[in-house]
Amino acid sequence: MKTLYVYADFDWLDEPMLVGELGYESLRGSDSYSFKYDNDWLRQYGSLYLSADINNYPGQQYTQPDRDIFGCFNDALPERWGRLLLNRREQILATEEKRPVRKLSSFDYLIGIDDYSRMGGFRFKEKQDGEYINCEKSLRIPPLTDIRALVAASMEIEKSEELNQLPEKKWLLQLVHPGTSLGGARPKAGVMNDEGRICVAKFPSRNDDYDVGLWEHLSHLLAKEAGVEAAETSVIETGKKYHALLSKRFDRTVEGRRKHFASAMTLLGLTDGCDAKSGNGYLDIVDFILQNCCDVEQNLRQLYRRVAFNIAIGNSDDHFRNHGFLLTPRGWTLSPAYDMNPTLNEYQALLINSTTNYADLQVLLDSSEEYMIGKDEAVYIIEEVKAGVKHWKSIATRLGIAKREMDVYEQVFQRSLK
């Protein structure tokens, strides 16, 4: 049994506090996890809801047989891109050390991530009187000036994947620490901007046929025009055909303190693949807001506005990982919106109401009462969103988005703004 001591280093705590112990065991290829709250944490903060699969009571708790690591820790894990980097590093090390390649578990991914850039407010120790794991200054994330080298390294990694070859170690070493703490499938890394703020840098892919980063930046600009609280973004030239997107980390304060983040997937107790096909949707998030959020009315209105915006720009990749919350002493509140980009799909990933995921603002208007929103207010919100989005083409032109790309997505905006 391996054990990690879990600490909350939340921005509203005077100092980091022990939350509990995370245990991991692998028997005959099957991974199991346990968690035990610290009594002092339960005494002071036992009313806070951290994860749908961990109850607020003393004693050992275990993951379900068909589940991986507890949801609240899963949010700190890398997804496809970060796991690719860690898996390829393990293959290279195994070759150098002349040993079999280990199959990495979620526990391995968790302890392999740089402490400084890990998402959210949890930190981990192997001994209570020891240092936090992976907090060495040598692992600090690179400056923005390294962006071109990081993009070049990510493209070399992609190239080696296409050729079914191991990448050169030098490319991995550039990316493995800044690039493994982040979710998502696309190439990315953490970088430090000129203000000393940590940002997510999303790189263009070798396989892109349009400027994905520039369109995501446009989406965030439009979101703010539409009254959606969204992550702050910018774009930077990479020396390649397309731009990199920079998104300021909203789980960090200006002073660098950690805000605790959890995805809607974690807080609702769901897994990847839970979406409209499984009968899940935005009303599940409504239920969570009613039960566990502070400023309930404000969060409900903001959620409704975000659904309207997603429909308006065709952002159909709106699954539960792409909705999140930040923890305050009074409960959860919606995090700034993130990962928004137009698509040509006419259906959202999540159900808009109890029956359909068809992306139509009239469907959303007719469903306003399911969001606890009155009809008049719903009309007002939707009209504000449409007003914020209607000048999309002039903003896209100002950003330098190619006309051929605008022609592709014009049908999406025309459909929602009719």
Sequence positions of predicted segments:
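Phosphate/dinucleotide-binding and metal-coordinating scaffold of catalytic cores
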Residues: 1-320, 324-418
